[in-house]
């Protein structure tokens, strides 16, 4: 029966460590076989055969094999625990990074909406003021036109003045519209730059966190391997 720890460690890219443990076990097995062959030679020279002694020797080999099997299973369980802890830390760091990213993006979006709303409010008030003034001017022009219908020259002069006023009002509206578009584009550009910078910082933080987790995991795995090998060899 293959231990669960050895199967999982093969997926984690650490088969050489298990091979080293198996190699150490093979060396011990070879030593025992060599010592066993020497005992067989000694037994051939000795005319008396101890059958009970051979049975006890076979039981000792089985006990040693069981202990090695238990150590390997414990070694696999330690690797499984380390991998599970690594996975939990990665999930924790990833969730924290995603949460921070969402908060920053929401803040950027909220700021952008507030700035756009502020611009809309300011320029709406200015547009309304100019339009109201223009309507008042037109009303005055109509009233003056009705009163001065018999005075053509004076009416023509007023008409020319009104045309100049209308041209100025239209020019003011055009300037306000162009300024509004320019400010809106500047806000969008600044927010895009801020979003790009935030995304770049988040990528750097994720890379640093991943590197830190990998280093901690490698150190923990090496410590587990040393501990398992020491318990296996000594």
Curated annotation (Swiss-Prot):
What the entry says about domains is: Composed of a long central coiled coil domain. The N-terminal and C-terminal regions interact with DNA.
Looking up InterPro entries in the UniProt record yields:
XLR/SYCP3, XLR/SYCP3/FAM9_dom
Fill in the PTM field for this protein. Phosphorylated.
**Could you tell me which Pfam families the record lists for this protein?**
Cor1
What top-level branch of life does the organism fall under?
Eukaryota
Cellular location(s): Nucleus; Chromosome; Chromosome, Centromere
> Where do the record's region annotations for Interaction with DNA lie?
51-56, 86-89
**PANTHER family recorded:** SYNAPTONEMAL COMPLEX PROTEIN 3, XLR/SCP3/FAM9
| Region ranges (Disordered) | 1-57
Q: Which GO terms describe its biological process?
A: cell division; meiotic cell cycle; spermatid development
Protein name, as recorded: Synaptonemal complex protein 3
Give the compositionally biased regions (Basic residues).
1-11
Family per record: Belongs to the XLR/SYCP3 family.
Q: Which residues carry this modification: Phosphothreonine?
A: 198
**Which terms in the Gene Ontology molecular function aspect does this entry carry?**
DNA binding
Region (Important for oligomerization and fiber formation) residue spans: 67-72, 229-234
Oligomeric state and interaction partners are given as: Component of the lateral elements of synaptonemal complexes. Homotetramer; the tetrameric helix bundles assemble end to end into long homopolimeric fibers that exhibit a transversal striation with a periodicity of about 20 nm (in vitro). Interacts with SYCP2. Forms a complex with EWSR1, PRDM9, REC8 and SYCP1; complex formation is dependent of phosphorylated form of REC8 and requires PRDM9 bound to hotspot DNA; EWSR1 joins PRDM9 with the chromosomal axis through REC8.
Q: Which residues carry this modification: Phosphoserine?
A: 35, 37, 57
Annotated motif Nuclear localization signal: location in the chain?
Answer: 86-89
Tissue expression summary? Detected in spermatocytes (at protein level).
């Amino acid at each position: 029966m293959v231990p669960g720890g050895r199967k999982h460690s093969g997926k984690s890219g650490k088969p050489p460590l298990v091979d080293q443990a198996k190699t150490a076990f093979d060396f011990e097995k070879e030593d025992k076989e060599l010592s066993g062959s020497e005992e067989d030679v000694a037994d051939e020279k000795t005319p008396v055969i101890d059958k009970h002694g051979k049975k006890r020797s076979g039981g000792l080999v089985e006990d040693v094999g069981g202990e090695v099997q238990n150590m390997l299973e414990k070694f696999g369980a330690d690797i499984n625990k380390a991998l599970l802890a690594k996975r939990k830390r990665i999930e924790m760091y990833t969730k924290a990074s995603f949460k921070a990213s969402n908060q920053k993006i929401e803040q950027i979006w909220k700021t952008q909406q507030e700035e756009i709303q502020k611009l809309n409010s300011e320029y709406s008030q200015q547009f309304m003021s100019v339009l109201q003034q223009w309507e008042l001017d037109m009303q005055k022009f109509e009233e003056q036109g009705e009163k001065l219908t018999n005075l053509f020259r004076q009416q023509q002069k007023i008409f020319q003045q009104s045309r100049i006023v209308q041209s100025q009002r239209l020019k003011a509206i055009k300037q306000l519209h162009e300024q509004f578009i320019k400010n809106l584009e500047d806000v969008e550009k600044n927010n895009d730059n801020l979003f790009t910078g935030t995304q770049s910082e988040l990528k750097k933080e994720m890379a640093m966190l991943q590197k830190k987790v990998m280093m901690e995991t490698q150190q923990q795995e090496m410590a587990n391997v040393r501990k398992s090998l020491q318990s296996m060899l000594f």
